[in-house]
Amino acid sequence: MSVPPKYRKIKDFAKFYYDKPMSVLTIFVGGNHEAMNYLQEQYYGGWVAQNIYFMGYSGVINVNGIRIAGVSGIHSKYDWKKGHFETYPFAGGQIKSAFHTREFEIMKLSLVKDPIDIFVSHDWPTIISNHSNVKILTRIKPHFDKDIRNN
C-alpha cells in the first residue's frame, strides 16, 4: 500500500475477511489507500469478503432495482491516458500508478445506456467544496487547501 509505514497494519478488514461477516451489504470503490495487489485480482469487481463487494476499476451493479455505477482510483494527469500496466510485485512508481484512474474507465461508463441512480467515486467532484464550510474543512485537513484552490 502506498501509505506511511504507521498505516501499514492489518486493521478492521481482516476481522471481516476471516471472522465476522459484515452485517449489511457494503459496496466500495478503490482509492489510494487500498491494497491494490489484492484489488487487481478483481478488475471487473467481485466479493472481497462476505457481504463486501468491490465494484472493480469501473462498473455498474444492480442492487434491488437500484443501479449503482462506480469508478476506482484517484486522478493523475500522468497516467490518465495510459492503460493498466502495473504488475505485482509492484516496481518503482507502480505502487502509486496502480490506483490512478484511467480515461478509458470513464469512457466505458459513458457507454452505459440505462439510467444510473447512484454514482460512486473516490475523488470528490470538482467544486464540491462550494457546498461546504471550507474554513472548517481546511482547518481539519490543511492539505486540502491547495486542491480546493486548483479545483
Regions found by a protein language model. Name each.
Residues R8, Q50, N64-N150:
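Active-site-proximal loop/helix segment associated with metal-binding centers of metalloenzymes
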Residues M1-V63:
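Core catalytic region of metal-dependent phosphoesterases/phosphodiesterases
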